[in-house]
């Protein structure tokens, strides 16, 4: 009996998409095939597609069954606890091993045979879901065990000590005799607040933040600094000047001398009383030196009183100097050389 609903194929037969062919039609296909009828003739006679007939006959020749679906039920489970244990062992020995290498080792070690060995995708799923978390946890535990104890952090700006309630309280605690006292800045390092301002980074804290009720000393506030002047400091003794003895000052004044040519430290010279610098005389670059050689060589090494800046060797330069050509100068030099020889 054909179903009342379905679709019609090219041969005019009715079929339901996604449903297997009824067992009666399957059995009829096998019987006709045993009678020697060709699959194409069976397809036309029963109005079943040629692909369906070929598939049913091929399955019957392989398994001897005409039932649809897998033969023998579902595939037996291959990811047994023993297989998972061996996979974990292989992964721990070689963390960089691949899934196909694990599959080959399972076959080589005899853990599985070719029928129940897990596929590469199954081994990858086992490594990801069952062994991955355990491996990471084991590495984390071993890292925590082998990790050295953290070193005590160096306190920020530990060289300078700052007044704080903790150090003040620590300073009040008496120390037993014979035990050296520990400074407050070393015994209790300063704890900075969780602020990231410039003053906190540079170690400059406001004095108003450091005032504590338990501190025995009075810390001036920022507002009080402006009122502090020279009048608040105790006056010096009459025999002392700025906190120094008069005798020491007189002794230093007695042996202190000002450099030659320079005014004293306490005296000032006005700019108007100083004469301007003398302007140097302009000398032409084309001026020739016409002094006698004997006057230049035999002259003394110091400047004469009657000499001028232009004639330091007491030899006068004529007022009117004529420009001589280069040829005349060369001829004169040649004549002097010849006469000297």
Curated annotation (Swiss-Prot):
InterPro entries, sorted: Homeodomain-like_sf, PAIRED_DNA-bd_dom, Paired_dom, PAX_fam, WH-like_DNA-bd_sf
Residues covered by region (RED subdomain): 82-130
Region annotation Interaction with KDM5B: where it falls in the sequence: 168-189
DNA-binding region(s), residue ranges: 4-130
GO molecular-function terms, A-Z: DNA-binding transcription factor activity, RNA polymerase II-specific; RNA polymerase II cis-regulatory region sequence-specific DNA binding
Keywords assigned by UniProt, alphabetized: Developmental protein, DNA-binding, Nucleus, Paired box, Transcription, Transcription regulation
Location within or outside the cell: Nucleus
Domain of life: Eukaryota
Keyword Nucleus: yes
Any one Gene Ontology cellular component term annotated for this protein: nucleus
CDD domains in alphabetical order: PAX (cd00131)
Start and end residues of each stretch annotated as PAI subdomain: 7-63
Chief location: nucleus
UniProt-listed PANTHER family: PAIRED BOX PROTEIN PAX-6-RELATED-RELATED, PAIRED BOX PROTEIN PAX-9
Protein role: Transcription factor required for normal development of thymus, parathyroid glands, ultimobranchial bodies, teeth, skeletal elements of skull and larynx as well as distal limbs.
Subunit structure, interactors included: Interacts with KDM5B.
Protein name: Paired box protein Pax-9
Protein species of origin: Callithrix jacchus
